[in-house]
């Protein structure tokens, strides 16, 4: 229902911005990005270079592309939000032919009046210097003449090239930048950057946390069939013996030393840096989370059984836009009834949610930083006896998970605490007969890092201060489950964004009601949308 309004409103906003000069002023500062690059250098090995490429432009259909989203690592280090760029960070200062010192180079897309008339203004070389504080900036077509001998470095570290990048005619684009880099770095045809990245995950994680890494590797192997033939990855992922994982770790370390091309160091450094947030980052992340919490509140007030999943999604996303969050951090999940049992349900096309529970997992992205907040509410405003029984188990599981989210605790501590509560609760209700069966109805992990990515980068080690994680237990009982039919179609997930501090966990999304009593009370509040009626269409 609200999508028509959003389309018109966004059209008006576009006209205003096209002719005006006002843009948001609360992005990360140039000093932030510069300081992050200095932190990168502190963690680099001697005589090394890190190479970061901008994200590719992605095609939606025919001649229409998706809205461009910068690679989070590239944005983190540069603040540059355009495509077709490459950043080089050197471990030590160098000199160019004019004797000028430098420790970083950035190549950006060239100013082009015709292209800018159609697609928006570009920073270009001078804008990148002025706005982002870089000194050594060049047009992308100059990268082919880069005065750097990659063979002279002990380590040339970069992320993989598995993204779909197109070769556009004319200007130097991402395709050309990557092609040039591969030629100059003697990139072998059989190099497996994703494999090297997973090797890095093995070697950079303390052996006592290797069980968690093994689980992650198992998921990667399922998603990347070309990696399934790698014996080191396969044995590590399938081993339950820490001694075996330690032996594989030593073998991986040997393999990593065979040439100067590497995907380990760059991955390890970015995992370390992005795991903990600076105060400047926390300002933006907190705003994204608060916006998302307000979205949940406004939907609670507006909810009624005749609403569609799409309409509910539209209310959330209108709130985001109203507060200046231009995008969502990930595809919005709005699942009524049995649809909520699909963990990543994004169709959101049920015409009426009826009297079911509605699971809403959404997050606003504010200036690159994304929230991830989930609430589950009864469409008719009142929890049934069965719905409340399941909800209360999940609520108490989340409380246990949040309480376990303290400095020094293992990354899996919230999940362990939450899982115990879920298992006991399901046993008490008679939904399961053995503790091991709880995994049937709670099949996912409880936490992930949060930041520039909804599943942000980190080391998966002990919790550190200024880390932001999610705590999101859930119970999902799809139709046809091996339990009493009265439980079928009930899906509950509660997800909050938690800041780890020396004084204990801080719930950044606490504004959105979590208890059944608080939710029901909020749903009785009037909504600005109560009197909003669109004309019917034939």
Feature-to-residue mapping (PLM):
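Bacterial N-terminal signal peptides that target proteins for export
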Residues: 1-6
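Bacterial N-terminal signal peptides
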Residues: 7-17
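Active-site neighborhoods and metal-handling regions in enzymes and metal-associated proteins
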Residues: 21-538
């Amino acid at each position: 229902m609200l999508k028509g309004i959003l389309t018109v409103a966004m059209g008006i906003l576009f006209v205003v911005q096209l002719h005006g000069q006002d843009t948001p002023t609360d992005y990360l500062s140039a000093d932030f990005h510069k300081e992050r690059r200095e932190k990168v250098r502190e963690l680099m090995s001697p005589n090394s270079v890190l190479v970061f490429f901008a994200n590719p432009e992605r095609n939606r259909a025919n001649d229409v592309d998706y809205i461009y989203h910068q690679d989070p690592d590239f944005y983190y280090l540069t603040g540059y939000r355009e495509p077709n760029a490459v950043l080089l960070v050197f471990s030590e200062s160098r000199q160019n032919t004019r004797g000028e010192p430098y420790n970083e180079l950035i190549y950006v897309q060239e100013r082009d009046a015709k292209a800018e008339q159609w697609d928006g203004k570009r920073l270009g070389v001078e804008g990148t210097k002025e706005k982002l504080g870089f000194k050594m900036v060049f047009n992308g077509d100059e990268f082919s003449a880069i005065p750097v001998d990659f063979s002279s470095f002990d380590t040339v570290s970069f992320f993989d090239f598995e993204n779909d990048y197109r070769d556009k005619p004319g200007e130097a684009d991402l395709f050309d930048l990557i092609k040039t880099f591969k030629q100059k770095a003697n990139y072998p045809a059989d190099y497996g950057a994703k494999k090297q990245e997973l090797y890095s995950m093995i070697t950079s994680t303390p052996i006592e946390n290797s069980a968690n890494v093994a689980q992650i590797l198992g998921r990667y192997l399922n998603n990347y069939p070309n990696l399934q033939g790698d014996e080191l990855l396969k044995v590590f992922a399938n081993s339950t013996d820490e001694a075996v994982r330690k032996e594989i770790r030593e073998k991986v370390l040997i393999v990593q030393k065979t040439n100067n091309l590497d995907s380990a160091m760059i991955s390890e450094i970015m995992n370390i840096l992005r795991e903990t947030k600076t105060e400047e980052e926390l300002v933006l992340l907190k705003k994204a989370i608060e916006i998302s919490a307000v979205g949940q509140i406004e939907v609670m007030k507006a909810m009624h059984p005749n609403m569609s999943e799409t309409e509910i999604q539209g209310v959330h996303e209108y709130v985001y836009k109203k507060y200046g969050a231009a995008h969502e951090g990930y595809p919005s999940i709005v699942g009524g009834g049995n649809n909520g049992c699909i963990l990543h349900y994004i169709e959101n096309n049920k015409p009426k949610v009826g009297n079911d529970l509605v699971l809403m997992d959404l997050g606003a992205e504010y200036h690159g930083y994304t929230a991830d907040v989930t609430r589950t509410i009864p469409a008719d405003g009142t929890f049934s006896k069965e719905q409340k029984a399941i909800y209360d188990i999940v609520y108490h599981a989340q409380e246990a998970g949040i309480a376990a989210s303290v400095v020094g605790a293992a990354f899996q501590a919230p999940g362990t605490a939450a899982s115990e509560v879920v298992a006991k609760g399901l046993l008490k209700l008679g939904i399961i007969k053995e503790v091991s069966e709880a995994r049937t109805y709670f099949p996912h992990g409880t936490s992930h890092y949060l930041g520039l990515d909804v599943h942000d980068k980190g080391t998966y080690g002990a919790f550190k201060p200024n880390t932001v994680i999610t705590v999101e237990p859930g119970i999902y009982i799809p139709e046809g489950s091996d339990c009493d039919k009265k439980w079928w179609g009930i899906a509950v997930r509660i997800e909050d964004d938690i800041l780890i501090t020396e004084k204990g966990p801080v719930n950044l999304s606490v504004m959105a009601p979590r208890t059944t009593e608080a939710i029901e009370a909020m749903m009785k509040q009037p909504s600005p949308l109560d009197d909003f009626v669109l004309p019917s269409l034939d």
